[in-house]
Amino acid sequence: MEQNVFFLPHEGLKLAELAEFLGAELVNSDYADVIVRSVAPISRARAGDVCYILSRRSRDELATCEASAVICDKALADLVPQHLPVMLSSNPHAAFAMAGGLFYPAALRPVAFSGESEIAPSAVIDPSARLEKGVIVEPMAVIGAHAEIGEGTRIGAHSIIGPNVKIGRDCSIAAGASIICALLGNGVIIHNGARIGQDGFGYAPGPRGMIKIVQIGRVIIQDNVEIGANTTIDRGAMDDTVIGEGTKIDNQVQIGHNVQIGRHCAIVALVGIAGSAKIGNGVQIGGQVGIKGHVTIGDGVQIAAQSGIMTDLAAGGQYGGTPGRPLNDYLRDVAQQMSKTKLRGKKPGGEQND
């Protein structure tokens, strides 16, 4: 890749310094003073780059790799050619992620749309709003009456913070986001165009059509949650919609009213979660999954992409398909269906039907 003008390389660290930061072991101290500035995939890592490996499938790429360091666990160290410095880590993937954050700290947050260091003159801030020291408000942002913004938080250009909203410290609200009827903890990241706290989808059928049900709950977002671009999280109807600590939500996810999501979950793009569903801690949900309202998903569940979840799921299981079922059962069903389809497509004697 050519020089990236959006994220400039780090000024450089010695490998010994990087190893200490990562809690990794630099195998050969002769390389302690080698300077590294960036992270890169093994396929194109060059001098000054750090890469990592997770399996023996990387053997061929290592033979031609020119990286200044390879992060791996002890079981894979024998794969690395002698000309490449090795850093041993019990979790190479996490160590590589930490290295990336060290080299490119600005990339850990939404891109700033201005160089403002305080409050832009064009921002609209209600006089009753309370902003702690170090809050940055970019051009054309709007902050409503009695809102509270914690120290070190950045409010992006053209974003809207509604009345009485509370946002904790060291948060990043990207350009174009809107947050109403919500309470946010510390270290929360909201990406561009996300919509937090709007009406939930609630109607009662009546003789003259659909009667709107008032949505008078809130959205509660706990510490260190990250919410992707154009994701929508509805406020509760009578109760709250809650996103648990450390949960990461991808782009274009829809979360309905009263949904309860536990701690440290990962939810991939285009997932739809209907109202009042309860999701435990550490749940991983693949892309385009649909989850029925009022179901309960246990701790540690993993759900394959494009599944349709219509019933409760027991903790710790892997599930897939529509309707959602244990993953092995789903894969077996798919294999049988494909086998039958192939058989139907053949004439006696092995000739293909037209």
From Swiss-Prot:
Matches recorded under Gene3D superfamilies: Hexapeptide repeat proteins (2.160.10.10), MurE/MurF, N-terminal domain (3.40.1390.10)
Catalytic machinery residues: 257
GO process annotations (BP): lipid A biosynthetic process
GO CC, alphabetical: membrane
Keyword set, alphabetical order: Acyltransferase, Lipid A biosynthesis, Lipid biosynthesis, Lipid metabolism, Repeat, Transferase
Catalytic activity: a UDP-3-O-[(3R)-3-hydroxyacyl]-alpha-D-glucosamine + a (3R)-hydroxyacyl-[ACP] = a UDP-2-N,3-O-bis[(3R)-3-hydroxyacyl]-alpha-D-glucosamine + holo-[ACP] + H(+)
Pfam families: Hexapep, LpxD
Assigned EC number: 2.3.1.191
InterPro entries membership: Hexapep (IPR001451), Hexapep_transf_CS (IPR018357), LpxD (IPR007691), Trimer_LpxA-like_sf (IPR011004), UDP_GlcNAc_AcTrfase_non-rep (IPR020573)
GO molecular function, one term: N-acyltransferase activity
Pathway linked to the protein: Bacterial outer membrane biogenesis; LPS lipid A biosynthesis
Family: Belongs to the transferase hexapeptide repeat family. LpxD subfamily.
PANTHER family, A to Z: UDP-3-O-ACYLGLUCOSAMINE N-ACYLTRANSFERASE, UDP-3-O-ACYLGLUCOSAMINE N-ACYLTRANSFERASE 1, MITOCHONDRIAL-RELATED
Xref: NCBIfam families: lipid_A_lpxD, PRK00892.1
Self-association state and partner proteins as the record states: Homotrimer.
Function: Catalyzes the N-acylation of UDP-3-O-acylglucosamine using 3-hydroxyacyl-ACP as the acyl donor. Is involved in the biosynthesis of lipid A, a phosphorylated glycolipid that anchors the lipopolysaccharide to the outer membrane of the cell.
The protein's name: UDP-3-O-acylglucosamine N-acyltransferase
Organism encoding this protein: Rhizobium johnstonii (strain DSM 114642 / LMG 32736 / 3841) (Rhizobium leguminosarum bv. viciae)
Name of the gene encoding the protein in the UniProt record: lpxD
